[in-house]
From Swiss-Prot:
The gene is MDE1. One of its GO terms (cellular component) is cytoplasm. It catalyses: 5-(methylsulfanyl)-D-ribulose 1-phosphate = 5-methylsulfanyl-2,3-dioxopentyl phosphate + H2O. Substrate binds at residue 99. Pfam families: Aldolase_II. Belongs to the aldolase class II family. MtnB subfamily. The active site is at 145 (proton donor/acceptor). This is Methylthioribulose-1-phosphate dehydratase. Signal peptide: none annotated. It comes from Paracoccidioides brasiliensis (strain Pb18).
Length: 240
């Protein structure tokens, strides 16, 4: 932590601007808590602004996070080992997010914000896909209006009603950081994706900026809930 100066660089998280990352992350987490996405201290969010990465802490009730709880990393920074990460602000008595290397993987793809939730609908679709398609299957859905809220890929515009949305699924691990390699492999296999599902765990969603990451996360959760209900009614996710 040699990069942390006297005073812990508290000025990095002190701002009256509601659009400042240190204010946006607590606001996002409160919003996600109201949806049931980050209960029991689970989940998290991170925002990249210029050469700084702002990250919600680990093990903190997400609806109670305050700006002074936010970690700040210099960017770029190594993903591994954890001791090599360039923290320039570290809240006292709090632990860095175990999601950090996964967030960094999204930022390496040009993301401006990455969100991790423990959405029950996300978990359920991973189980349904496993049962119907096996462990190698991905989530697919088509001919649903909300698909238009998801990008086709970087610089490729938004998906259309008749497109088939595909979201890769990776297996969960005992420790969050151990998901990093599988997440990066899924990103390589699905270069246009803006999300990766984690079986029996949740989802990582990223966007070019905070608003896009948030709305894409909302659109995906809508689609997952709809997919679970469609399956219950015997309706196919992909229209033939």
């Amino acid at each position: 932590m040699s990069d942390i100066k006297d005073g812990n660089n508290d000025h990095l998280v002190e701002s009256d601007d509601p659009e400042h990352p240190a204010n946006l992350i607590p606001a996002l987490c409160r919003n996600f808590y109201s949806h049931g996405w980050v209960t029991g201290t689970g989940g998290g969010a991170s925002i990249k602004r210029d050469n700084h990465i702002f990250i919600a802490p680990s093990g903190v009730q997400k609806e109670l996070i305050q700006p002074h709880n936010i970690f700040v990393l210099s960017y770029p920074t190594p993903k591994y080992p954890p001791s090599a990460r360039q923290y320039i602000r570290k809240p006292l008595k709090l632990n860095p997010s175990a999601c950090t290397p996964l967030f960094l993987a999204a930022f390496e793809r040009g993301a401006g914000c990455c969100i991790h939730t423990h959405s029950q609908w996300a978990v359920l679709v991973t189980l349904l896909v496993e049962r119907e398609k096996g462990p190698e299957g991905c989530f697919e859905i088509s001919n649903i209006e909300q698909i238009k809220g998801i990008p086709r890929g970087k610089g490729k515009g938004m998906m259309g009603f008749y497109d088939t949305l595909k979201i890769p699924i990776i297996e969960n691990t005992a420790f969050e950081e151990d998901l990093t390699q599988s997440l990066e492999e899924a990103m390589e296999m699905y270069p246009d994706t803006y999300a990766v599902l984690v079986r029996r765990h949740g989802i990582y969603v990223w966007g070019d900026d905070v608003a896009k990451a948030k709305t894409q996360c909302e659109s995906l959760d809508y689609l997952f809930q709809l997919a679970v209900e469609m399956h219950r009614l015997g309706l196919p996710w992909v229209k033939s």
